[in-house]
C-alpha cells in the first residue's frame, strides 16, 4: 500500500461520519457540485475517465473527489463503487483544519495531486501517440 494511503487511513480511518455505498452505486458524479472529498475506508471503486474510455481502480486509503473539499468545483469525473464501500467525507472546513493542524496531511495531498498529474500527462501522451482525440 502506498505511503499516502496508509497515512490517510491512520489519520482519518476512525471517522465516525462513515457513508456506505453498495456495489454499483455512484459515489461522485461528473458535473455534481464538489462539496466533499471522500476517503475510501474499505471496498473498491472505479473512476471513469474521458467519458468512460479509461478507468482507474481505487482501494482503501485512496481519496475520491479530491478538489471538492479544496475549492468546491464540480466533480470532473464519475466514481462508482465496485464492491460495497465505506467512505469518510471531508468537507472544506475539515480539510482546512487538517491542512492547518496536520501539515503532513498537506504534504501527502500534494504528493497525491502530483501522482495524478503525471498519470494524466502519461495518459494524454498515450492517447496522442495512438491518434485518439480526447
Describe the role of every protein-language-model region.
Residues 1-134:
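Cytosolic regulatory regions built on CNB/CRP/Popeye-like sensor folds
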